[in-house]
């Protein structure tokens, strides 16, 4: 009969084998939550090393506390140094030497037998690390080198956490300069060679790296590299060309940083002016086959006939290498055709055109693929069902045979210096009637008043005097002789609209302004109608209505000042007003 001693919260008791079996069954039948109560009274010798069940999660450890414990002081210090703009540098220090006793080392037989000799107790080995952050130094100790780093980082964290974070200027972008120089924290990510080239590029300085000399045995070479940046020269030495080049850049970079900062300039964005479209697209034909590729058209014809598609074959190539000529053959049923071209595509197209002609289809003329520029030719435009002829002409381009006395001719006005703005139509009879010009409907009953040469000469003289001096002695004389015409103005007239009104009162014609709303350029447009002989029409553009009137009146005054001058212009046969 075996005996086992069990201790569970109660004094120890002796149990027999049958009692042990029944006790185990009762313990297994208890719920799982009762286990912590039985294990709560463990011996005190295990209190320092708690035993955790791997199958059950620990109730004392939460995910937050576990994540916090996983972050080491070195990681926290690196994150803090990035915010402060500092770089931590770890430097290992030699560990402490062991303190061993020299007793009984040089004696053969000591005072004590060797079997009873115990060495002097030796302290554990300690590692030491020196941490430097922004000019401050911290020492850390530990059983391992990593533990020493953690100790030094923890000391640095307690000191650096109290420092305020540097303020970053608002609106500053990465890479932007402050006082002509880039911030040091951005230069930390750049090599010294890159910084040298960047400074030289901004100051227009040439950079040249060259290996000055080599020394040492083949397995231990030493290189000296010289760098010249404008007037600055530096040398660097290293075991390889790369290291010596970097050291040379470091040497010359110290001198380049002493240069005064560059002045900052604000770049003005260039104003992009939209080009006016001077391209007229030719109207396409209503026939869809006119602009179709002959190759595609031939293929569609065969598909519509439900016949076999055309077969193309390259027969030969001839000519010089730079002046090749290809011969392509196309076969449709029993018909064959050939086409030549400078490349295979052109030859294939010509072969398809020839095949279309053989099959009896009309081959359209080649249409220009790109829009054509405006042509300078002035060709007459005829409208079906209308007996009028519209002819464009320019001043000075007289036609001896063009003096026709037909009553069904009507000549459109020529725009001498610029085109009419958007919203203004040329002075055809319908528009002239709408704006109030004394002009009948475009029928064959034209009633044109013959101009008076003497009155035109006087009008031109007054217009010239007003344009050049603002006053007109001729007009003053006319007003003095004719009391009913009006009073003489006191002082010169400065505005062209006032000068034109004064001239109209003296000569007895009317001036009428038509104002239009603002256009897409936020400008006003005014149309002026002068009932002189011949009638004159002009327009003005400006930021306000007064400037529009002045511009239009100035154009009319210039036309009136040229009435008495001989003109080579073609005689006018219609009664349409002149436009400028």
From Swiss-Prot:
Its main location: cytoplasm. Residues 165-182, 373-391 have a biased composition (Basic and acidic residues). Pfam families: dsrm (PF00035), Staufen_C (PF16482). The modification N-acetylserine is found at residue 2. SUPFAM superfamilies: dsRNA-binding domain-like (SSF54768). Residues 72-162, 191-258, 293-361 form the DRBM domain. The modification Phosphoserine is found at residues 183, 285, 397. One of its GO terms (molecular function) is mRNA binding. It comes from the Eukaryota. It is found in: Cytoplasm; Rough endoplasmic reticulum. Binds tubulin. Binds with low affinity single-stranded RNA or DNA homopolymers. Interacts with CASC3 in an RNA-dependent manner. Identified in a mRNP complex, at least composed of DHX9, DDX3X, ELAVL1, HNRNPU, IGF2BP1, ILF3, PABPC1, PCBP2, PTBP2, STAU1, STAU2, SYNCRIP and YBX1. Interacts with the influenza virus nonstructural protein NS1. This is Double-stranded RNA-binding protein Staufen homolog 1. It comes from Ailuropoda melanoleuca (Giant panda).
């Amino acid at each position: 009969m075996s005996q086992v001693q069990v201790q569970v919260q109660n004094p120890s008791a002796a149990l027999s084998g049958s009692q042990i079996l029944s006790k185990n069954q009762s313990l297994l039948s208890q719920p799982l939550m009762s286990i912590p109560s039985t294990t709560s009274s463990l011996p005190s010798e295990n209190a320092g090393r708690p035993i955790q069940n791997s199958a059950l999660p620990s109730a004392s450890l939460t995910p937050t506390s576990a994540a916090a414990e996983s972050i080491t002081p070195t990681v926290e210090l690196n994150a803090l140094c990035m915010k402060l703009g500092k770089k931590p540098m770890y430097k290992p220090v030699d560990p402490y030497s062991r303190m061993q006793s020299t007793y009984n080392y040089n004696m053969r037989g000591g005072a004590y037998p060797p079997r009873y000799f115990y060495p002097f107790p030796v302290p554990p080995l300690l590692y030491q690390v020196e941490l430097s952050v922004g000019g401050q130094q911290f020492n850390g100790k530990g059983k391992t080198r990593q533990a020493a780093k953690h100790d030094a980082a923890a000391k640095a964290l307690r000191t650096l956490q109290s420092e305020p974070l540097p303020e970053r200027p608002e609106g500053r972008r990465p890479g932007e300069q402050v006082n002509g120089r880039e911030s040091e924290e951005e230069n930390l990510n750049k090599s010294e060679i890159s910084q040298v080239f960047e400074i030289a590029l901004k100051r227009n300085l040439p950079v040249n790296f060259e290996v000055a000399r080599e020394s040492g045995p083949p397995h231990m070479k030493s290189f000296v590299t010289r760098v010249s940046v404008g007037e600055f020269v530096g040398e660097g030495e290293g075991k390889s060309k790369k290291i010596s080049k970097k050291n040379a850049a470091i040497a010359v970079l110290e001198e380049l940083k002493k240069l005064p900062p560059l002045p900052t300039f604000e770049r003005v964005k260039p104003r992009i002016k939209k080009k006016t479209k001077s391209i007229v697209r030719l109207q396409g034909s209503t026939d869809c086959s006119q602009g179709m590729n002959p190759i595609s058209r031939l293929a569609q014809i065969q598909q519509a006939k439900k016949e076999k598609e055309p077969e193309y074959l390259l027969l030969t190539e001839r000519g010089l290498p730079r002046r090749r000529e290809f011969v392509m053959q196309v076969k449709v049923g029993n018909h064959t055709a050939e086409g030549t071209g400078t490349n295979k595509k052109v030859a294939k197209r010509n072969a398809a055109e020839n095949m279309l002609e053989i099959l009896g289809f009309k081959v359209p003329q080649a249409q220009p693929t790109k829009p054509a520029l405006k042509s300078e030719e002035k060709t007459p435009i005829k409208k079906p069902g209308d007996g009028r002829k519209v002819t464009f002409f320019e001043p000075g381009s007289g036609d001896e045979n063009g003096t026709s006395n037909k009553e069904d001719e009507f000549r459109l006005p020529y725009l001498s210096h610029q085109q009419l703005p958007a919203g203004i139509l040329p002075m055809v009879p319908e528009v002239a009637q709408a704006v109030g010009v004394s002009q009948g409907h475009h029928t064959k009953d034209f009633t044109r008043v013959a101009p008076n040469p003497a009155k035109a000469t006087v009008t031109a003289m007054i217009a010239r005097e007003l344009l050049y001096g603002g006053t007109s002695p001729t007009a003053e004389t006319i007003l003095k002789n004719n009391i009913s015409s009006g009073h003489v103005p006191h002082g010169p007239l400065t505005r062209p609209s006032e000068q034109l009104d004064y001239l109209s009162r003296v000569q007895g014609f009317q001036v009428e302004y038509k104002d239009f709303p603002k256009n897409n350029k936020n400008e006003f447009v005014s149309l002026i109608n002068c009932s002189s002989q011949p009638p004159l029409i002009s327009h003005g553009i400006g930021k306000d209505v007064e400037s529009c009137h002045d511009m239009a009146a100035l154009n009319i005054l210039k036309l009136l000042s040229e009435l008495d001058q001989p003109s080579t212009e073609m005689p006018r046969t219609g009664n349409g007003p002149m436009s400028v």
